Amino acid sequence: MELKKDSNAVAIDMLLIVHSEKRRAAQATHLDPQANPGALLQNRGGFQGVRNGIRKWQELEENSFQGNLPEKQCLQQPQVITSYDNQGTQLTVEIHPQDAMPQLLKKFSLAKRLQGDKNGNMRPRQPGGKDAHAYPWDRSSLKSMPLDLRLFEKLDASASQVTVKSGLNELVSDLLQEAHSDLERVRAIWIWICHHIEYDVEAAQEKDRQAFKPTDILRTQKTNCDGYAGLFERMCRVAGVQCVTVPGYSKGFGYQTGQSFSGEFDHAWNAVYLEGRWHLVDSTWGSGLVDTTTSKFTFLYNEFYFLTHPALFIEDHFPDNKNWQLLKPPQSLRQFENSMYHKSEFYNKGMLSAHPETSMIRTVNGKATITIESRAPTLFMFMLNGKQEHGLLSLRKNGMKLEVYPPTMGTHKLQIFAKGNSEIYSSVLEYTLKCNYVDFSVQLPSELHQPVGPSWFSEQMGITKPSHSDPIIHTSDGRCAISFSVEEGVSVLASLHGDDGPITEETQRRYIFQLNRGKRTELKVQLPHAGKFALKIFVKKRQEQGNFIFVFNYLLCCANTKVNWPMFPESFGNWGQDNELLEPLSGVLPANRNVAFKLKLHGIAKALVKGQDTWPLTLNPEGYWEGSCNTAGCQEVYVMVLENANHNFYSYILKYKVNDQ
């Protein structure tokens, strides 16, 4: 007991109810005769072995009951009479310890919202049938209740700017200035915590440093998951909204695909009661993330964990009490461990499903196939054991298909990333691959990047109507021709890559000869030898600065060991986009031979071939420049043009080499 300066004021750590004699009689009829009316509420330190400090938080929460313990763990509660109509007046006096928060019963009508049990104990009700959502997810919404997030824009902006002036009571009061419903009250609290409370990575490793008291959390603005959940619950109670803290297992920081869970709980989150049903929130994961490499926290707001649909929430949250799954039917711990973990970005970026639906995949004949369905076109990439190798990823209008060929037997880690409108790829799925057979006939080039084959993305970048829609092209003689339409103002560049060559940037382009016929572009390809090659396609808008952008590639396959094609002639800057070379296509000419030339050149006055001597080319009626030259005594042969008839300066446009005699 502490006496204040005012002699009429007394601070007592208990709940005092003052009522009339009539009310005493009414009270006597409701009290359990076996109960000890003078017993104080005991500490709820019943979660043995909880690593993240839920037990400590509960010890600080005297005079509260969350209703999320199994029945056998519920402790004896004191009997409290809440109201008796027409039986006199009732005065309730609440006196709190220094670190506790007043409930503001009158201002926010908390007493009307909290539901009592048959004995009059005020506590949130346990979830029941009307709270349960069907499992599996019906794809209707990411939320457990209809929401239009645009209606929260003003409230979110206001709540995120509120600062702590004194204590939690005033903070909640400031937050609720723009809130006019329980949903808006919860939203304001959620936004404030997610934008102001930092996850304390260091304290997570040192239990003695963890902050559990609201005063400590507000002062340092740091805590751990149990602190987030406890603070969220206390703020909701001050705001007059039923809220409980739910402990359990999670697939969060440090989770390994396929791992099992036992022993201590490693996480805590909340359930809030809105519009007659319970809903789930996780303000820890809504506030940001911890970098796995640096172990540093970064604020990165995640809307996904606000009123998450329970059928999605169960993918990474398993509560201690199955009732708090809010699912029908509830899932077992074994199902939780074995189920596919779709990360929040999977759903944030509009994806619907993935196949296989288990986190562990066994290869079949050395191959594993993964497909993803999405609501809209999405960019994907993958990494196998940390490298973008040994797979073929093709984009579809509503998803993607990935074929993976592990290079060795054993266990492999497969990560899949997706990209929406932002410039950053986010991890959305992780699989563990078990490979007991390697198909050595499938040796993909290390430079084969993703995606393979034309798609909606190549159309978006200006390449349409491809001659080859399949990403894999087989050629028996080592040659192929690929064509597609190109939007006006778009330039195309191609290069050939193989593990055994070509090597230099020049040779990567010299096995491809590009022809432009109106709006169609044709790529003539000659392979230097048998094997598998990546034909990369790049584009660039001519009016924009910067480099060419990779769009997609083809996989070229040739099993003919006799293939040994030379490079195409080297072209120079004056070789126009619309020029066309018919012959000779080989970049190496035979020695001591007459060689015919035929080209279509635009905007020139004269053309000639220069070797040991000079041979002019003439323009025929079809618009082709024709002629021939003799390679005797030549090591190199050039095609040259005169663009202006009033000048005498010729420009090099093509260069050939001549075989040694």
Curated annotation (Swiss-Prot):
The answer to whether keyword Cytoplasm applies is yes
Q: What is its EC number?
A: 3.4.-.-
MF terms (GO), sorted A to Z:
peptidase activity
One BP term from GO: proteolysis
Q: Which InterPro entries match?
A: CAP/Cytokinesis_protein, Ig-like_KY, Papain-like_cys_pep_sf, Transglutaminase-like
Q: Where is this region: Disordered?
A: 116-137
Q: Specify whether Membrane is a keyword of the entry.
A: no
- Cellular compartments per GO CC: cytoskeleton; Z disc
**Signal peptide range in chain numbering:** none
**Which residues are annotated as active site?**
225, 267, 282
Tree of life domain = Eukaryota
Q: What is the annotated tissue distribution of the protein whose record heads this document?
A: Specifically expressed in skeletal and cardiac muscle.
* Family annotation (Gene3D superfamilies): 3.10.620.30
Q: What is its main location?
A: cytoplasm
Alphabetized Pfam families for the sequence: Ig-like_KY (PF23265), Transglut_core (PF01841)
UniProt entry keywords in alphabetical sequence:
Cytoplasm, Cytoskeleton, Hydrolase, Protease
* Phenotype upon loss of function: Mice exhibit a primary degenerative myopathy preceding chronic thoraco-lumbar kyphoscoliosis.
Q: Where in the cell is it found?
A: Cytoplasm, Cytoskeleton; Cytoplasm, Myofibril, Sarcomere, Z line
Q: Which family does it belong to?
A: Belongs to the transglutaminase-like superfamily.
Q: Which PANTHER family match?
A: CYTOKINESIS PROTEIN 3, KYPHOSCOLIOSIS PEPTIDASE
The subunit structure is: Interacts with IGFN1 and FLNC.
Q: What else is known?
A: Used as a marker for 'occult' heart disease, as its absence does not cause heart pathology in heart.
Q: What is known about what this protein does?
A: Probable cytoskeleton-associated protease required for normal muscle growth. Involved in function, maturation and stabilization of the neuromuscular junction. May act by cleaving muscle-specific proteins such as FLNC.
Q: Would you tell me the protein name for this molecule?
A: Kyphoscoliosis peptidase
Gene source species = Mus musculus (Mouse)
- What phylogenetic lineage does the species belong to? Eukaryota, Metazoa, Chordata, Craniata, Vertebrata
